[in-house]
Swiss-Prot record:
Region Alpha N-terminal domain (alpha-NTD), residue ranges: 1-236
Keyword flag Ligase: no
CDD domains, per the entry: RNAP_alpha_NTD
Pfam families: RNA_pol_A_bac, RNA_pol_A_CTD, RNA_pol_L
Alphabetical GO biological process terms: DNA-templated transcription
Name the record gives this protein: DNA-directed RNA polymerase subunit alpha
Length: 353
């Protein structure tokens, strides 16, 4: 099968991801990605938003059991809130949980005073993030004892689904919002490349409950999308296949006909044979990049960190590599081969002969 790698390699990809922290950097941040091809801001923004809100793992309370309470429509002496109000407050508890559930936690308090989420007796693998959340108020002499069952999951699970078949009397199931992401919004603006404004800039704002940072949340969402889409890619683009490359205008022999084996013959070509500007050639030389095989394994970010190497030189090299069916950031297993100089000389002799 012939793979037209230009389908994805010639699309503009964001070369910069700017992260703008909010007032609380652990809970809120805005991500700015540009430039994107026209329409990709909406495509990526909507996909990331849906995954962020629906698919990330988290922890939540699934049920509670309060001493001397038979059902959620009860009230307790000395407790100002009804049980229904307590349930609503319990649903807002933000938990960070390691390992698998379900697990049980205890909350005991004596009045007068406020009962807060921070009063919950937690184990070493569970942390309450919003310790100042008020669960209820107790009057003088009142006591309050509650058992909470917590578990891990994703999305939203209604209380009716959290009731076990053999639920004891007094067990009150709770709606569980497992998602650690509280709010996601995005805005698409125009981005400029030179004099062209026909590109997108994606502004993605993420707010979490503190159990996961916005940076990690976005990374998880992107990884989920990557994992789901992998099924649809039925070819390997690491080394171009389906065609015999041209080296210096001469068709290269099939890989199995020489010691190069499966290596693309271009990889054995020296970078000083490329028609590059003096600046670009000197930058590659100073960075000890000798063969094209050395060059293609460099990422764009690594190249831009090279002294005196700028965006113009990067675009020049990307264009030259693209004409050969190669790109930056490739993974070439077994590179460099131990006998690379011998292989390069043999290839040169084959071309001259």
């Amino acid at each position: 099968m012939t793979v037209n790698i230009k389908n994805w390699q010639e699309l503009k990809k964001p070369n910069n991801l700017e992260i703008k922290p909010g007032n609380d950097s652990k809970r809120r941040a805005t991500f700015v990605a540009e430039p994107l091809e026209r329409g990709f801001g909406l495509t990526l923004g909507n996909a990331l938003r849906r995954v962020l809100l629906s698919s990330l793992q988290g922890a939540a309370v699934t049920s509670i059991k309060i001493e001397n309470v038979l059902h959620e429509f009860s009230s307790l002496a000395g407790v100002r809130e009804d049980v229904t109000d307590i349930v609503l407050n319990v649903k807002q508890i933000a938990l960070k949980m390691q390992g698998e559930g379900p697990k049980r936690l205890q909350l005991s308090a004596t009045g007068p005073g406020e009962v807060k989420a921070g009063d919950i007796a937690v184990t070493g693998d569970i942390e309450v993030m919003n310790k100042d959340l008020v669960i209820c108020h107790l009057d003088e002499g009142a006591t309050f004892n509650m058992e909470l069952t917590v578990d891990t999951g994703k999305g939203y699970v209604p209380a009716v689904s959290n009731r076990p078949v053999d639920a004891p009397i007094g067990l009150i199931p709770v709606d569980s919002l497992y998602s650690p992401v509280r709010q996601v919004s995005y805005k698409v603006e125009n981005a400029r490349i030179g004099q062209e404004l026909d590109y997108d800039k994606l502004n993605l704002t993420v707010e979490t409950d503190g159990t996961v940072t916005p940076e990690d949340a976005v990374a998880y969402a992107a990884r989920i999308l990557q994992d789901q889409l992998a099924l649809f890619v039925h070819f390997d683009d690491q080394v171009p296949v389906g065609h015999v490359p041209m080296v210096a205008g001469v068709p290269a022999h099939a890989p199995e006909e020489s010691d190069a084996n499966q290596l693309n013959r271009y990889l054995l070509k020296k970078v000083d044979e490329l028609e590059l500007s003096v600046r670009s050639a000197n930058c590659l030389k100073n960075d000890n990049i000798i063969y094209i095989g050395d060059l293609v394994q460099k990422t764009e970010a690594e190249m831009l960190r090279t002294p005196n190497f700028g965006r113009k030189s990067l675009n020049e090299i990307k264009e030259v590599l693209s004409s050969m069916g190669l790109r930056l950031g490739m993974d070439i297993p077994g590179w460099p081969p131990e006998n690379i100089e011998e292989m390069a000389k043999k290839l040169e002799q084959e071309l001259l002969g």
